C-alpha cells in the first residue's frame, strides 16, 4: 500500500485521480502534532520517502532570518519530525527504509543565489548519513537523492515568472551538460530502486542524478 501526503488538498486530489489505488492524506509535515496523529493510524511502515521542499532565491544578503527559519523548517525539520516518529515502528519490526530528497546544490556543489536552499540540502546530507550510521544494526537503511534541475510544474512556473521566459528556459538548458533537464520519472525510478530489496546493501549514500552537473 502507498500513502501520499501533502499540505495541498488540490494536489492530492489530482494525484488520487491519476492513481486511484493509492491512499492520500492531508498533512503538514512541519507540525509534530499532525504527524503523530497520522502515524498513530499506521502500524507498519516499510519505506518513508521525504520529498517536501522549498526554494528560496538569493544570496546571504537577500536571506532574512524569517527566510532562513522557514527554509529549514520546511526542508529539514519536516524530515527530522517524520523520521523521529516513524523510527520506533521500524526498530520494532527490525527493518526499514528511509529516502530523503536532497539536491546537488548542497555539500556536493554550490550554485549562485541558492544560499539557504543549499544550506538546507547540505543539512539533509548530514541527517541522512547520521540516521544510516545510528540505525544500521536495526536493519534500517537511509539514503538521499540529489537531483539536478528537474522538469516539473514548479520549474515551468519559475521560467514563466522570469522577465524573459524564453531566455530563462534557454539559460536553464545551457547549464545542463547533457543538454536537457531530468524528468520526474527518472527521479522516481531512482526512488523506486532505493525503496526496493535490489538496493538492500546500500545505505548512507547520497545519489546524484544530475546529468553530469556535479562532475
Regions found by a protein language model. Give the residues of each.
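Substrate-binding pocket helix/loop in short-chain dehydrogenase/reductase
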Residues: 59-60, 67-72, 172
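Active-site helix of classical SDR
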Residues: 83, 120, 128
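Residue(s) in the substrate-gating loop at a strand-loop-helix junction
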Residues: 103
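Short, flexible catalytic-loop segment of classical short-chain dehydrogenase/reductase
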Residues: 9, 147-157, 196
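C-terminal substrate-recognition "lid" of short-chain dehydrogenase/reductases
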Residues: 80, 180-209, 214
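Alpha-helical segment proximal to the catalytic Tyr-Lys
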Residues: 88, 133-137, 200
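Conserved NAD(P)H cofactor-binding loop of Rossmann-fold oxidoreductase domains
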Residues: 52-56
Amino acid at each position: 500500500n502507498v500513502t501520499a501526503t501533502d499540505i495541498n488538498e488540490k494536489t492530492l486530489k489530482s494525484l488520487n485521480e491519476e492513481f486511484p489505488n493509492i491512499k492520500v492524506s492531508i498533512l503538514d509535515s512541519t507540525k509534530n502534532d499532525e504527524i503523530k496523529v497520522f502515524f498513530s493510524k499506521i502500524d507498519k511502515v516499510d519505506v518513508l520517502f521525504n520529498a517536501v521542499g522549498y526554494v528560496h532565491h538569493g544570496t546571504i544578503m537577500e536571506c532574512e532570518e524569517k527566510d532562513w527559519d522557514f527554509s529549514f523548517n520546511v526542508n529539514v525539520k519536516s524530515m527530522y519530525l517524520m523520521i523521529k516518529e516513524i523510527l520506533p515502528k521500524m526498530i520494532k519490526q527490525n527493518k526499514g527504509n528511509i529516502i530523503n530528497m536532497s539536491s546537488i546544490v548542497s555539500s556536493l556543489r554550490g550554485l549562485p543565489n541558492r544560499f539557504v536552499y543549499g544550506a538546507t540540502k547540505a543539512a539533509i546530507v548530514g541527517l541522512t548519513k547520521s540516521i544510516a550510521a545510528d540505525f544500521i544494526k536495526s536493519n534500517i537503511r537511509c539514503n538521499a537523492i540529489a537531483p539536478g534541475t528537474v522538469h516539473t510544474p514548479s520549474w515551468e512556473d519559475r521560467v514563466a515568472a522570469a522577465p524573459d521566459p524564453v531566455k530563462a528556459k534557454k539559460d536553464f538548458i545551457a547549464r545542463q551538460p547533457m543538454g536537457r533537464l531530468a524528468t520526474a520519472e527518472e527521479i522516481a525510478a531512482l526512488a523506486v530502486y532505493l525503496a526496493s530489496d535490489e538496493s538492500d546493501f546500500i545505505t548512507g549514500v547520497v545519489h546524484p542524478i544530475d546529468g553530469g552537473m556535479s562532475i
